[in-house]
Amino acid sequence: MKGKFIVIEGIDGCGKTTQIDELSKWLPSSGLIKKGSKLITTREPGGSHLGKRLRGLILDNNQNNKPSPLAELLLYSADRAEHVYKIISPALNNNDWVISDRFSDSTLAYQGYGRNINLEIIKNIESIVCQGESPDLTFFLEISPEESIFRRKNQIPDRIESEGIEFLEKVNKGFKIIAKEKNWTVISASQNIKTISNQIKETVLNNFSKNT
């Protein structure tokens, strides 16, 4: 029996990191994770050793090092292939739980809807890269592009975060389309941290309490 795979998606600034931290603190005492199983939190890009190096290439804010849209897509895909092979699949096959900050649908949103790369090309690449792995539960933390920019105003942005609001609007629209198609759990990220966390916990319990 495989472990459970939870993914949290959303545009930058939506609070994914905070909510993954909240969820990872609660899950071990929730009664959902069987004795002997572990909880692993990870992220994309950068979840593996190779991924950390690729993350530096992907997010480098030096415009002289900016990759083409296709090269960017393939770098993300290389990161994910390694992430699945080295981290996600071994954990799930060991009956461990995995929570990931982003997975393959971020590529559809950012490189597909954001960069206008053909969605079928991305889906074909991802079908190879993901090696059959897909989330058991995906959350979409929804905020407006304007709120995203406001929340990050005092941060030093990486290359993707430096893109203008038009790009962010396209990405956000993509996430909304994907969320509807795949029946994700959509949560307003404009609420306070505790309210969002409680909604995530309730959904996790409802989805997994009968299966553990």
Curated annotation (Swiss-Prot):
UniProt EC number: 2.7.4.9
Cellular-component GO terms for this entry: cytosol
Enzyme type, top EC level: transferase
Key word Nucleotide-binding present: yes
PROSITE patterns: THYMIDYLATE_KINASE (PS01331)
Reaction equations catalysed: dTMP + ATP = dTDP + ADP
Example of a GO biological process term: dTDP biosynthetic process
MF terms (GO), sorted A to Z: ATP binding; dTMP kinase activity
Source organism, top-level taxon: Bacteria
PANTHER family, A to Z: THYMIDYLATE KINASE (PTHR10344), UMP-CMP KINASE 2, MITOCHONDRIAL (PTHR10344:SF4)
Family, as annotated: Belongs to the thymidylate kinase family.
Role according to the record: Phosphorylation of dTMP to form dTDP in both de novo and salvage pathways of dTTP synthesis.
Full protein name: Thymidylate kinase
